[in-house]
Amino acid sequence: MDPPRDIQHFKRNIASRSTVSSCSSLAMEIKRKKIRESMFFPSEDCDIKEKMEFEMRMRAGAYKLMVASTKKEQVLDASRSLLTCNARIKAYMSEAQKRTGHQDFRRPSDSQGQVPCKGKVAISGLRIPLFWKDSEHFNSKGNTQRVAVFCLMKIGSEIFDTEMVIADSSMTDICFEGVKIFSEVKPDFELTFELYICGLDEEATFANTPKKLARKLRSSFGRSSGRKLCPLLDGGDPDTFLQSNPIPPGARYSLLAYTTLGLEQAEGSFQSHSLIILQNVEASSWLPLYGNLCCQLVAQPDCMTLDMMSGFLSQQQSIEGLQRRCRLYCVLKAGKISCYYSPEEIQAKVEPILIIPINKETRIRVVENDHQRPGSRLNLINPGNGDSASHVFIAESPDVLQEWLDSLWQHIYDQSQWQHTCDKLMEIDVLSPRKPPLFLTKQADSVYNDLSIGSPGKFESLTDIIHNKIEETNGRFLIGQEEETEPPHWAALFEGSRPIVVQKTVLSPGKESNRSITSPDTGSKKKRRAPPPPPDKLPFTSVSTNQEKENCKGPKPRAGRPSLDAKFSAIIQQLQKSHTSTRKNAPLGQIETGQQPEKRAEESDLPEYTKKEYIVDPQPPVPAPRNKLRMSFREKMNPKAW
């Protein structure tokens, strides 16, 4: 039989320090937490080791590329990658040492402290103004010193670099495009900005003496001893790597200027910051800096972008002395509690029915339970200019109430640490804003918008467009007739409000006969072609005198064509000219003044005032015979035959 276990019971005293028995359940929970922490930190260490191995491989590849490159720009770009990889390796090594030290001295009481939430920091629109002399900037003839410039930005172990930019005296400022976003940033962050420079006109001569010496040392030792020596020569330490793999002087970058930005500089707009310029650097004379850095620094705390707490709460309302409860889905985010009827309203982007601000002025109280009103109640009071607004919520259980209390106090603490960045959410632009163009160019699809076609995106051939237009107008489009305008408003003539030009219509037997001939008759058969006119008679020319006299004072109203007719008017005129050129017409002449046609008996009986409105026309002209070699309509519309 097992001996009975020694069980000790302790009572917690608030005044004295509480002790925990090794056999109690709380002690077992603490042990489990330590085991979880010991399992968690090796995974973080493995993550850092993987990052270090990746940067080491990138560094080796960058050095090989630098040695194999023949162009100076490629050598400088590879040297930039090599410098960035070394900086990241140093940051990972220091981060691993910090985590190892924190793991050794970690205590359970340390986790009880209040820690602010993390966030994101983005920097964009980097612009460095230059201060050239007038003689160097305006009188440069291509003999100026060119330099390669790039930037490094660091927050903790996160390091970003920019692209390499070639600068000369013709540039007024150096611009770097793109946005660099740092994640998992604390509110007391320090963003270090460094500007590196290298001359482009210097020759890069590689000195491989240390590498040759290392190879001789490896070959002089045995195979086993050489393997042990290889990690020492090609270790992860950046200084050791640069000793065995030196960078040529012509491709070696130098730190020219630096600055440090913090939470106070995160305004969300473009600001100018001072740069600390190193005067003892030889390259400081190559690039005259104005001494400022223009950029946009944005900070986004997690409490402004993530839901810090969410769940159902019952709001207690008093309507005309009656108490009622309304169950609402509440979300704590961005300094306020948004209340909805259901979580689906958030996905549907429905406006919340109630918004309660949460800030340092908000008073949070817990109302004690009573027999008449069971349940844990939470009272939120926001004092204002007048009456203070009070909202009472009832939680489902004391545990839920405690979670909401912890989240509310944590949210207020996060706002106090992130300061002005919690007043309004700062947006992070995906692309850095660029300079606007000097001249605004026209859009490429504006030509299709000018055409009066039903669908601008529909690609049709010229023949199809004209054929469809002819079918819509029943052939009037090809003949060139104007569209009929609306009849004039005769009521306006008697009112006298608008001037109207009245025009008489001159009728002649020749025109009536021509209309009867040219009018389509679907029921009759095809008529026989008329014979050519005799050579001794001249063709007919109509003369209208009364019409010209009546219309000489007022302009003749012209019906407007649609935009498509205006587009293809030149094409139709060309088609009509080609059509008339194929006919064999007789030479035209003019009617002599002495030759007057005989008047008909019917016209002699008309009164004098009717004779003024009519003009007696001679015999109508006889059309010329058509050419036998007549082209079809599709042959005329073919652009190859033009």
Swiss-Prot record:
Listed transmembrane segments: none
Ranges for domain REM-1: 30-105
CDD domains named in the record: PH_rhotekin2
UniProt key word Coiled coil: yes
Key words, A-Z: Coiled coil
A Pfam family assignment: Anillin
Gene Ontology biological process terms from the UniProt entry: hemopoiesis; positive regulation of cell population proliferation; signal transduction
Composition bias type Basic and acidic residues, residue spans: 597-615, 632-642
Keyword Nucleus: no
Domain PH: 306-413
Region (Disordered): 505-563, 575-642
Signal peptide extent: none
PANTHER family: ANILLIN/RHOTEKIN RTKN (PTHR21538), RHOTEKIN-2 (PTHR21538:SF21)
Listed name of the protein: Rhotekin-2
